[in-house]
A protein has these predicted regions:
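Amphipathic alpha-helical segments
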Residues: 31-55
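Beta-strand-connecting loop/turn residues
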Residues: 57-59
Length: 246
């Protein structure tokens, strides 16, 4: 537990991050300092709670287990503010930009499907679901920086319950498919994650569902080139034999 509220530790923390503060009046970190603070505050929390480790700026993951791994990362609202998102990366599902690419390494990791806190999606005013590089209401001094840090920690406390619920609800492939079905019916997620239908079909193929082919063919791709590229990867999936095991 970080004890930011002792005078000496507050002063030390402020002194550590002072070189990254570039506004004379208010707390405003540059990008390097902000990521440094985020990892200082959250690396241990995420490791202790979910056994995920930092793999790059603003991203934590575990190792592959049954073709997938958990990923918690920053969901950037803009260049200055973010919240957390949490989801899964799949070893056997590619990502398409201008061509099919695989996302199997820490460097290339991609969160295929994820969720955000309902408190963030439906937020009204400041409900501690977002943190940022700067806060104009706090002065650039030890006390102001303490409050800035405290706000970051409150965001984690606000989001924590939803993260736990999500990973419990997607702990098996069967549960994962059920969750994806729910999200495909949700207006918000169908808008920000239209690729959930692709993830759904790929998982069905991986667990050897006889419906996988039909599910894939129902997907509305932007063009045939994209569909063909995905289908090539889809056809090569080796099925998983432990679908019904917890």
């Amino acid at each position: 537990m970080f004890n930011f509220f002792k005078k000496d530790s507050n002063s030390l923390l402020y002194d550590t991050y002072k070189p990254f503060l570039f506004d004379e009046k208010h707390v405003w970190l540059n990008s390097e300092g902000w990521y440094k603070l985020i990892h200082y505050l959250f690396d241990d929390k995420i490791k202790d709670e979910f056994n995920l480790i930092p793999i790059k700026n603003g991203c934590w993951a575990d190792t592959y287990n049954d073709g997938r791994r958990r990923v918690i990362s920053l969901f950037h609202i803009n260049t200055s503010f973010a919240t957390f998102k949490w989801g899964w990366n799949f070893e056997y599902i590619p990502h398409y930009t201008s061509k099919i690419t695989w996302c199997r390494t820490d460097k290339s990791i991609y969160t295929h499907t994820f969720e955000l806190s309902p408190k963030f999606i439906n937020r009204k005013g400041d409900n501690y679901t977002v943190f940022g590089k700067f806060e104009s209401k706090y002065k650039n001094n030890s006390e102001g920086f303490q409050k800035f840090v405290s706000d970051h920690l409150k965001v984690w406390d606000t989001l924590h319950e939803a993260i736990v619920e999500y990973y419990n609800a997607t702990s098996t492939y069967e549960k994962m498919l059920n969750r994806l079905e729910e999200n495909q019916k949700d207006g918000y997620y169908s808008f920000i994650l239209p690729t959930n239908s692709i993830i759904y079909a790929f998982i069905k193929k991986y667990v050897h569902s006889i419906e996988a082919e039909d599910d894939f063919q129902k997907i509305l791709f932007v063009d045939e080139k994209v569909k063909d590229a995905y289908y090539k990867a889809f056809s090569k999936i080796k099925w998983y034999s432990n679908f019904n095991k917890s």
